[in-house]
């Protein structure tokens, strides 16, 4: 929302003074959220509506201008990307830790023989180390898949609109620069 407010001001869609007021109001709301001082009302549809209501209560009508040239669909798409990106990083770390444990177990069992199975039947002798490395390699492929997915999370949806963007002269490149995304979604 701060990036959106900054872009609205820079593009002259709203007055710079209003943009600055919105940004300062949002910073205050963020600080209060982090301090546990804000409790969201179920009277409003979602967190975005709650924040806009609190912002308007704090700074007046300028708070209503935050939604100018923006779709809630954009906000939800961005929130999902930010959440998934954060979770992918956490999941990837857990998988890598698991891979390290598998590799350590493999290293400690280079000569521990066990039966290998095919179609639920004993097939040939293998080492437990070899068996552990098979799982480590499966996990490695999962890490690669997560990294590929992570790249897609860097596409910035702000400004896409619910259907066909907006008639306001927004600057999507500025939005993705301010949000630190890699590419702008078409």
What are these regions (language model features)?
Residues 1-165, 169-175:
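A helix-coil-helix interface module used to build multimeric assemblies
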Residues 176-184:
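Conserved small/polar residues in nucleotide/adenosyl-binding loops
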